Amino acid sequence: MVLKFKLNKEQERAFQIVANHSIFPHQDQLKMYLGGMGGTGKSRVLAALSDFFALQKEAHRFVIVAPTGSAAALLGGSTYHSMFGINDFNSNAQLSKVKANLAGVEYVFFDEVSMLSARDLYRISNQLSKVLNSPEDSFGGLNMVFSGDFAQLPPAVGGEGVSLYSRSIGAIASSMKSQEEAIGKALWHQVTTVVILRQNMRQKIQSTLDNQL
């Protein structure tokens, strides 16, 4: 995979963390953040991971979601709203549909995480725990790989004040909404496996082309 997708050292490290985690049984739940500016190759890591699971004949274990339809379409994934049944009335039929969506799924690649508010993250984790009947585990015990660039695209509603890194969240959690925001922020703090891509692959390609002229 490293050679096929021409991964650099940073990209290879991110790929190996997920690939190795998927191979060895009885691993702790993976909660990972893959960060980096545009052009550093986050999508290339995703492509390598998708191909890895497909070659293992285990594509069902790996799903891709994003906050918007356009972002999801670019990655060949779904919106998290449709995949997880967020914003839908949780009837038995709807919960059964979400459970079917997640049948066999063990890894979720979540792109454009900067667009999530802290409350969004709480609602996602709460829904997954409910659907997968795993109330003790955040995100229903699924392995989560969040990706994005916090220098871009803050939450569409509320901006930086409701973001996962907002300092104002948790100071006073008196209402249900503020409590959910505080839990969401705490969930983000559980994401302790971090790989930041720093090498701009677009600039590298352009420099190579310039040298050939």
Predicted features and spans:
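Conserved ATP-binding/catalytic motifs of P-loop helicase motor domains
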Residues: 1-213
